[in-house]
Each structure stands twice: as structure tokens, then as C-alpha cells.
Amino acid sequence: MSIPLILASASPARKKLLQMVGIDPIVRVSNFDESTINADDTLHLVQTLAQCKAQTIAPKFDTGLILGCDSVLEVAGEVYGKPKDKSEAIERWQKMRGQVGTLYTGHALIDRVNNQTLTRCGITKVHFANISDETIIAYVDTEEPLKCAGCFALEGKGGLFVERLEGCHSNVIGLSLPLFRQMLTDFGYQITDFW
């Protein structure tokens, strides 16, 4: 019998990543108000948000592991979560094009049996293509960038505008699989315990 993994996220990309490696998570959306958190640096911000999301869901479960994640993109000192609307997405892309950004994904894992919590952060450098205003507008019109931290989906059309990555590919999608596996190991589990 596998150990239940509860994903405290509405992200279809995170769920799909877990399913690709043989884990079928129970999905519970935390609805945590992210605007209540202020942090001194991006790394601390994403780890705190991930932990708050997981902690919001944890009391609903007596067993299993709760996984919370949060991603933001930092470009030239500006931190980008999901854009509010199309005009903000266009403005961000005009600043991002031709630049190198840093994608931070905070991971929080709560073991309900042992009442322990781990937080970690995956960091990946993203090199963006220098695309035209027309391409930016066409991409934003697909509405894909409105659903993603950093205004792009690597696993979607946005992948066309990324020239290269330095670091973990799955981290950019929203969940670093190698980091998640290591967190399980740190708790004394194996990834196969969740198949």
C-alpha cells in the first residue's frame, strides 16, 4: 500500500509532473492568501508561501505527506508571480525578453505521521529569447502566460521563447523532481513508497 501524497496546489503542471513519475497525488487547493506574506528575499518568500500552503491543508489529514509549492521569477531585481491581466503580462515580457531570469520554486513537505516539516528551494536560471512586440502580444493573447508565475509555461507555447536553462527543468514547471526526491529521502522515505 502506497503512502498518500497530498498536493496543496491547483497547478495542473505540478500534478502532471508527479503523475509522470508514478505518483497519483490527492489534490487539495489551499486557497491561502499569498498577499499576507512579505519577505526580505525571494528565496525566503517562496519557501514561506509553500509552507503556508501546506500548513493550511495539513490539519485535514491524519496521515500521509503534504506538499506545498510556490514559484516566482526574478528578472533584473523584479519579482514576478502570476500577472493580473494581459497588459501586465505584455509589460513583463517586454522587460524579460533577451534577459536572464531566476526561477525560484519553494517546496514544503509536511509528514503528518511524524509531525515534521522540511522546506527547500529549487533555483533555475532561464535565458529568454529576444522576441518582438508582435510575438509577445500574440503569446499573451493565448492567455497561457496569465496562468503562470513569470508569465510563461515552459511545457507549453512559452517554451518556444526560452533559449536555455541552467539548472533543473522540472523546477521551472513548478516542482523540482530531484529536490522532491531528496526531501523524501531526508524524511526516511523512498520515492517508490508513493507508487
Swiss-Prot record:
The active site is at D70 (proton acceptor). It catalyses: a ribonucleoside 5'-triphosphate + H2O = a ribonucleoside 5'-phosphate + diphosphate + H(+); a 2'-deoxyribonucleoside 5'-triphosphate + H2O = a 2'-deoxyribonucleoside 5'-phosphate + diphosphate + H(+). Keywords: Cytoplasm, Hydrolase, Nucleotide metabolism. Gene3D superfamilies: 3.90.950.10. GO terms for cellular component: cytoplasm. It comes from the Bacteria. It is an enzyme of class 3 (hydrolase). GO terms for biological process: nucleotide metabolic process. Its main location: cytoplasm. One of its GO terms (molecular function) is nucleoside triphosphate diphosphatase activity. It is found in: Cytoplasm. Its cofactor is a divalent metal cation. Its EC number is 3.6.1.9. Belongs to the Maf family. Nucleoside triphosphate pyrophosphatase. May have a dual role in cell division arrest and in preventing the incorporation of modified nucleotides into cellular nucleic acids. This is Nucleoside triphosphate pyrophosphatase. It comes from Microcystis aeruginosa (strain NIES-843 / IAM M-2473). The lineage of its organism: Bacteria, Bacillati, Cyanobacteriota, Cyanophyceae, Oscillatoriophycideae.
